[in-house]
Amino acid sequence: MASPNRYDRQGITDARARVPGPARRSLLAGVAALGALGAAGCSRVATASSAPGGDLLDRLRAQGVVRLGIAGEIPFGYIDRDGELTGEAPELARVVFKRLGVDRVQPVPTEFGSLIPGLNSQQFDVVAAGMYVNAERCEQVIFADPDYQMLDSFIVRKGNPKGLRDYRDVVAKKARFATGTGYAEIEYAVEAGVKESDILIVPDQVAGLNAVEADRVDVFAGTALTTREVVKKSAKAEATKPFSPLVDGKPRVDGGAFAFRPTETALRDAFNTELRALKKSGELLRVLKPFGFTEAEMTDLTAKELCRR
């Protein structure tokens, strides 16, 4: 999970991406994909505001709709089989923006690596993709406080025959290792001693499950949430117990949040006010629970502290 945040849990630029720590995919990749996004994109492109704190919230209220950048990653933000927008971030966005006076949300699907470039080029108004907060991304966008926290987990064959519990086990047991495009898990594995050239990169957790089931790899690394969900119907694979990856020898817990353009501090602050109220009332968990989130994923982490990492 987007992983959901990782080498950019969306590619080296993903809701997970690689950065000076374990960032998630390198956020600068995806410029090419941005071109495609612009071609396909929205008919309406918002203009940047020079007003202190930005005036986007006022404009969204007047329009009655907010455009959400999503990456098609279950359970964070995706279009379901009925063609409807759903996922933890879009559903949370519906609740928060309704409270802020914006009645509708409109999806703008793109690659994970194009989310930040797309946001900053006005292709959409906010990133709603469960994106991990890290220092590299904080240089390009501003984040709300995290609406969830996340540990890592592995997909392994039933019974976990190699006894893989964390990245150090992958190295010690010379396990064949895979993870997703731009996932922060790339950085975590390299930090533990896995050679980057030995990592099999696949599009997402479904492809990772398929690789494990087909015995192409011994293990696929993702977020505890995404691995837990994707193996539910598998007869050949299981998810390991969640664990914290080590960064500079210290356990790391990631947090996912909504991203905004750096000029739109007023919108970010208003969003945070409503998010804090949802956390305090317990409504946040009720909104996220249908997507596999539990009390263990609730968090008091702040964007400020995660941006320092």
Q: Each predicted region: which residue ranges?
A:
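Short helices/loops that flank or line small-molecule/ion binding pockets
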Residues: 95-99, 106-109, 113-127, 140-142, ...
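Extended ligand-binding regions for polar small-molecule ligands
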Residues: 43, 90-99, 160, 168, ...
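Extracytoplasmic small-molecule ligand-binding "clamshell" domains
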Residues: 51-129, 139
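Flexible hinge/capping segments at coil-to-helix
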Residues: 59, 157-176
